């Protein structure tokens, strides 16, 4: 069974839309640090086709799927909100105890990491980094095709 880690922000949760719509987004302490916005992670919309695609992976017999995200150190509520977000959007039977919050993604052992950014160890991940949003993997359909999941 192959292990797949899937980032949350920018991969299945639309962080960019959320920060642009947040009522405090233009206030000085948060400019350039949208991850510190209070409640930023609570009500993010899912990225198009992300929920359906992740459910396909969760139900696929060849993959062991985990959510792997970094939560801002200075925004401890974000740690809880990320968990609540996945419970809101996925059947808890499929995702229970499958959330890993980590600032050093390169330390985890796995086959694939689906992540939109190279930070927090994503680009040094020992398995294969599937760079979501890149030319090769612009949308979830391209990720599923690459993993040979229908």
Predicted features by range, described:
Residues 75-150:
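C-terminal cap/substrate-recognition subdomain and adjoining C-terminal extension
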Residues 1-3, 63-64, 109-111, 127:
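Short coil/turn segments at beta-strand junctions that form active-site/ligand-binding loops
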Residues 45, 50-80, 86:
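Substrate-recognition element of Asp-dependent hydrolases with the DxDx(T/V) motif
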Residues 1-44:
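Active-site neighborhood of HAD-like aspartate-dependent phosphohydrolases
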Residues 41-46, 90-93:
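Short, flexible loop segments at the rims of nucleotide/cofactor-binding pockets, characterized by
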